[in-house]
Amino acid sequence: MNGEGVSQCAVERPAATRRQFLKTVAAGLGASAVLGRPVSAVLAAPQQASPARLPTALVGGRICKSHAAVNRLECPERYDAVLAALRESSYFSALKHFRPRPASDDEIRLCHRDTYLATIRRDIESGAPKLTSGDTFICRNSLLAALFASGAACVAVDAVLSGQAKNAFCLTRPPGHHATAERGMGFCIFNNVAIAARYAQQKHQVGKVLIVDWDVHHGNGTQEIFYEDGSIFYFSAHQAPWYPGTGSKEETGRGKGLGTTLNCPVARGAGREEVFAAFQHQLAPAVDRFKPELVFVSAGFDSRHGDPLGRLELTDRDYFDLTGLVLEMADQYADGRVVSVLEGGYDLTGLGSAAAAHCDRLQQG
């Protein structure tokens, strides 16, 4: 990927229209409601004219491969696998490419403490093989890659909120949703989605933000950072019991954030039925109450069947349809504005095909 912009004209939408898509999803669920409303009501609603189509932004670059710590799973080849799958897709030329930039220290401080940033720099300068604050492996270029990963998410926010793109996918690493305010863990250094959410609020005056996390692992860092914040709603559908051991149904927020954390743990072996039920019956009504102005996806593809770090059974088609459900929610309340950021996914072939299915649905809008 060379970072050059491509044509801003999206490819023609396939025959599977929004209306057909809703019917397909509803049939697959065996349910009579989508997003908390009867399908008949959704389909009977007047169809408004769509604005001029905008492209999906693809934000990322080879700089993220410079984080090449001794880790055979969260490896630079993850970037290559996703990029190769996207390049082989029929829609790659319709994506608009944006160059990432490093996040500033002030942007990192939106979610992380100065002491943690100092710890990272000290650990890297000392040549330590992993962060002393957790189990994340590092190398001499890890800080640079992590700064670009967080900065890429901010670039995506700018692209979507300025009207340069309808939505965005950040092809970056290391992932971020396990990183807390003062600790890196679970392959994560900085919490990319959390930083971008705060950035959207501070720079673009966005009010309410929804974060949808479908990684097989619970995003303990994201939950912790926003646990007492009523302006950011965190939803996670994840395997339990599983690493990192957080994310029970009883964890719903605290203080002003009470009711803005929603965890839907599913058992080992769960697949489409269980995960889609969580989206339809738990998330959709919550979104109707919360009414977000911007939506983020912590897009972890280790919930795909066959992933070495997960035991769920989602398929590429499931990610395509889950993306459609998120887009429908964003259409209702956030003018369709969605920023997706890569999290986990460690079977290279499966990661590539799942991410490509996700981006396919994003670019269809």
Where does each model-flagged region fall?
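HDAC/HDAC-like amidohydrolase catalytic core signature
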Residues: 2, 8-365
